[in-house]
Amino acid sequence: MSAGSPKFTVSRIAALSLVSLWLAGCTSSSNPPAPVTSVDSGSSSNTNSGMLITPPPKMGATPQQAPQIQPVQRPVTQPMQTQPVTEQPVQMENGRIVYNRQYGNIPKGSYTGGSTYTVKKGDTLFYIAWITGNDFRDLAQRNSISAPYSLNVGQTLQVGNASGTPITGGNAITQADAAQQGVVTRSAQNSTVAVASQPTITYSEGSGEQSANKMLPNNKPAGTVVTAPVTAPTVSTTEPNASSTSTSAPISAWRWPTDGKVIENFGASEGGNKGIDIAGSKGQAIVATADGRVVYAGNALRGYGNLIIIKHNDDYLSAYAHNDTMLVREQQEVKAGQKIATMGSTGTSSTRLHFEIRYKGKSVNPLRYLPQR
């Protein structure tokens, strides 16, 4: 039978139909589709999406470590280092002056503006008293100013410096000041002093003397006491004897202020020692050289230490410097030989007493007054 005969064609079609029916029976099978099995658990579940489920990481696998949280470090506050503050020459607080002044190179008594003074920026009561030749306490009392002696710019003060007598070297002194005070101390500046015609004499600090409760700045090497010579045109410059007459009771006798060796003698030349220095031990007694009244007891100035000044009469004063302990107070009456202090080394480099005698404000050699020993 040829391939193109009708019988062959029918047979072929029938065979193909049987194959199609068989295939259709396979697709209509009642067996459910194979389940999708989870990799990790093995349990079955149906899915309609046909998407693969990504399994979680297996136990024992090293997970990616999360970044560790670093502790927050707070900045450590370093202690502030205190820097030295340069003292400003002038500070103003509520219109008032707060001013710390060094008097080392400021001439005293140089004001010649009359009996009043107008406060300027930078002034203090101490400074005004200094340049007008007054004691700051008297000046405060005269102008009703109480401690701490605050001033206002433009304030007018009564300084009592009506005469305004100039002194060679830029210093000045008035008779009003001379009548009020009579304390004399040391200096290393040379000048000519005009002496007021009053029984009590006061000299400017720049010329080797000072008003009550004031001392000169330290212009001398440590351990050396220096006082510039003073020329007083209105009084005799010849050194008097201890028995010289005076307008007040004469001093009958002088006595040594302490025991010990004289280690520095009086020097009359310019820049020389205007007293004597006596060596001793700390705590050694120092006594008044004669009867008198204490007009100064303090330590307001570097280089002189604890200083006591005694006024014996209108002409004579004695000074005791570098004391360790002062046993008297200002305005106290003392007797010759009375213990007034103990020896020390305040304001100097070694234990000693610097002792001076002044006659009408002029330094004289204490050895000419003290008894021989």
From Swiss-Prot:
A lipid is attached at residue 26 (S-diacylglycerol cysteine). GO terms for molecular function: metalloendopeptidase activity. It comes from the Bacteria. It is a lipid-anchor. Sequence repeats lie at residues 199-205, 221-227, 233-239, 240-246. PROSITE patterns: LYSM, PROKAR_LIPOPROTEIN. A lipid is attached at residue 26 (N-palmitoyl cysteine). Residues 36-50 have a biased composition (Low complexity). Residues 30-70 are annotated as: Disordered. Belongs to the E.coli NlpD/Haemophilus LppB family. Activator of the cell wall hydrolase AmiC. Required for septal murein cleavage and daughter cell separation during cell division. This is Murein hydrolase activator NlpD. It comes from Salmonella typhi.
